[in-house]
Structure formats: structure tokens, C-alpha cells
């Protein structure tokens, strides 16, 4: 598997091809987090704040997916995780200038 580089400092330089590649890389990371022992070769570049915001958003996505799988969509646990995820996504977008690819 080819190592993917995600550059969070290139917010205003993103075009559709790069943005699609970012979405695929993040999707692969989320699937890797869901499957035990699956390592995704990704390198992430950015400032400390950008990296922290990215980690928060990825972690929020994982927690939301886990809550959805365990409790279903209409459970308070899932709602709480969705709210936390939305805050993490806003933080990511504010820090990087990049729209989060999985906003729903």
C-alpha cells in the first residue's frame, strides 16, 4: 500500500483531486481504526494546532461510528458522540481552512 501524505497547511491550495485524495485517506484511516491490527501508511503534516484538530476529528468520527454500531442512531450515547464530533469538525475547519470531507 502506498504511503499517503496529508498536508494540512495547504488549505487554500486544495483542488478537487487533492480533496478527493484527502477524503479517501481519511476513510482508510477510519476503517483501519475500526479493524484491529490494520495499519494505514499515512503521514500528516501541519502545525501542532492543526494536527491536534485533525486527531480530534478522526477520534470523534471513530467514537461516533462505535456508538452508532453499538447503540443505534436514536440513542443518547450516539447523539452525545455526534455533538462532540461536530465540535471537533468545526475546530478542524477553523484551524486548517479545509472542509471536513464526511460532514453530514
Q: What do the predicted segments below correspond to?
A:
Residues 3, 8-16:
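Proteolytic processing junctions in secreted/extracellular precursors
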Residues 17-27:
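Cleaved targeting-peptide boundary
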Residues 53, 57-61, 67, 74, ...:
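Amphipathic coiled-coil alpha-helices
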Amino acid at each position: 500500500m502506498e504511503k499517503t501524505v496529508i498536508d494540512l497547511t495547504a488549505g487554500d491550495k486544495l483542488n478537487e483531486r487533492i480533496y478527493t485524495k484527502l477524503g479517501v485517506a481519511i476513510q482508510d484511516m477510519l476503517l483501519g481504526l475500526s479493524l484491529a491490527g490494520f495499519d494505514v501508511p499515512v503521514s500528516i503534516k501541519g502545525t501542532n494546532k492543526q494536527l491536534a484538530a485533525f486527531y480530534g476529528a478522526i477520534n470523534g468520527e471513530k467514537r461516533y461510528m462505535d456508538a452508532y454500531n453499538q447503540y443505534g442512531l436514536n440513542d443518547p450515547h450516539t447523539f452525545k458522540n455526534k455533538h462532540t464530533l461536530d465540535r471537533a469538525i468545526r475546530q478542524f475547519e477553523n484551524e486548517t481552512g479545509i472542509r471536513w470531507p464526511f460532514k453530514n
